[in-house]
């Protein structure tokens, strides 16, 4: 596996080859990331992965400085997966001048849910992803469904900018007890880790209530959301949101859309101690 930090060197290595299958990451790799590498390979070699902890998507009180950086362990894992190139730029490589131009997703998608609680997050994500796409020029790029809203925003960005890349969704990988794998799970204490699977259990209960009730009105949807928030809050969680939304655009479903049976997704973000976890479940 070649490890490259310079943009021009990366382009030189990729010139004359089939366009790559690309998986962007922030490192601290786990089985969820590795499953995306395998999915990328199904869409063709060479597979290019990137590791870059992107300052632009962290807020002033978030964990940029403490975000786990495990480069050597990540290299070992990527080599075992047969990744052709690891693109690991420094901040100076990717942002040689201050990044004055940003990609700002539309408010109706970028300022809701995660965007409401992490202002500027998706602007930072879209900016770095567009820049990485420019560097790698991939044929396909794989993003995990665990970051459901991010996946949708990247897909829409690629479509609206007519980027010649297909966005491929990868399924969420979970621990045996159901907790979605995440680099931030390492922040959990032993007691918190034992409690953490209650998040996906709550989403499954929400899904079952929706299915059992054959819900067709927005008021009942709101009541189910409030019940789930109260249930987790009673266990010590601090909820940012539990929201039942349309899969197509993450907007709240109208009565007419509910009656038409439009596909829904449940999304959540919640803090357990100091650790903020996100998850989702399609209905």
UniProtKB/Swiss-Prot annotation:
Residue positions binding (R)-pantoate: 57, 150
Residues binding ATP, per UniProt: 26-33, 144-147, 173, 181-184
Molecular-function GO term, any one: pantoate-beta-alanine ligase activity
Binding site for beta-alanine: 57
CDD domains per record: PanC
Pathway in which this enzyme or protein is active: Cofactor biosynthesis; (R)-pantothenate biosynthesis; (R)-pantothenate from (R)-pantoate and beta-alanine: step 1/1
Main location: cytoplasm
EC code(s) of this entry: 6.3.2.1
Enzyme class label: ligase
GO-annotated cellular components: cytosol
One Pfam family linked to the record: Pantoate_ligase
Catalytic center residues: 33
Keyword terms of this UniProt record: ATP-binding, Cytoplasm, Ligase, Nucleotide-binding, Pantothenate biosynthesis
Reaction(s) catalysed by this chain's protein: (R)-pantoate + beta-alanine + ATP = (R)-pantothenate + AMP + diphosphate + H(+)
GO process terms (BP): pantothenate biosynthetic process
Keyword Nucleotide-binding: yes
Localization per record: Cytoplasm
Cross-referenced HAMAP family: PanC
Extra facts: The reaction proceeds by a bi uni uni bi ping pong mechanism.
Function description: Catalyzes the condensation of pantoate with beta-alanine in an ATP-dependent reaction via a pantoyl-adenylate intermediate.
Record note on quaternary structure: Homodimer.
Family: Belongs to the pantothenate synthetase family.
Protein name: Pantothenate synthetase
Organism: Polynucleobacter necessarius subsp. necessarius (strain STIR1)
